[in-house]
Design a protein with these regions (language model features):
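Structural helix-boundary/capping segments
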Residues: 128-183
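Conserved acidic residues
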Residues: 87
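Small-aliphatic-rich amphipathic alpha-helix that forms the alpha element of a beta-alpha
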Residues: 76-79, 114-138
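Short helix-loop capping/hinge segments that flank enzyme active sites or metal/cofactor-binding pockets
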Residues: 12-75, 92, 96, 136-146
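Active-site charged/polar residues at nucleotide-handling catalytic sites that mediate phosphoryl
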Residues: 84
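Short, surface-exposed loop/helix-turn segments at secondary-structure junctions
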Residues: 7, 99-120
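Acidic helix-start/capping segments at beta-turn-to-alpha-helix junctions
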Residues: 1-9
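Flexible loop/turn segments at secondary-structure boundaries
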Residues: 1-2, 97-100, 143-144, 160
Length: 183
């Protein structure tokens, strides 16, 4: 399985269960269906709706991912840092430049239609899945004036070091104008 499939398995199992419990405990009267109706533009709403309508991740599939696949990802990621004697990875935070919410949907990446949700989370998934610290920092504004970001990932347990690296980056990054936000 690729990292997107594993990420979706873990996320969707945990989100459907955890978010439902959280919303019920909050007592604010907002249910998962209400929330889904409000986040459809991101692509996440449609995916959550599918899960609620019977495509939920089974306990067996989740257990396999968390006990077998996740440790393999953790080991692979640890090897990258150790074998290359590096403290952090630096990468574009997303596969796509940011879009206005009204323009979200799907894009073609490497000849394959991909939801904006997957494209925007693809690069940050290895650390998230493996339990490594990850940091996303504004890098610049795109030609359309929207903020673009870079990501930093560190080895498990390097949270403070990674924050120090991010803070050092922000000190040397050119000052960025604030994006113009439409009301």
């Amino acid at each position: 399985k690729n990292i997107n499939q594993i990420g979706q398995t873990l996320t969707m199992y945990e989100v459907v269960r955890g978010l439902t419990e959280y919303l019920e405990a909050s007592g604010n009267g907002v249910g998962l269906g209400d929330l889904i109706a409000q986040i459809t533009a991101s692509g996440m709403g449609e995916r959550l709706k599918q899960l609620l309508e019977g495509e939920a991740v089974s306990e067996e599939v989740y257990s396999h991912a968390i006990t077998t696949i996740r440790p393999a990802i953790q080991q692979s990621y640890a090897n990258v840092f150790t074998e290359n004697n590096i403290q952090a990875l630096l990468f574009p935070a997303t596969l796509l430049q940011p879009n206005k919410i009204s323009e979200l949907g799907t894009s073609t990446i490497r000849g394959k239609k991909t939801s904006y949700l997957l494209a925007s989370s693809h690069n940050v998934q290895p650390a998230s899945i493996g339990g490594s610290p990850g940091l996303t920092v504004a890098a610049s504004l795109t030609g359309s004036g929207l903020p673009a970001a870079i990501g930093f990932d560190g080895p498990i347990g390097s949270d403070r070091d990674l924050l120090a690296i991010g803070m050092a980056y922000e000190k040397i990054r050119p000052i960025m104008p604030s994006p113009v936000l439409a009301v």
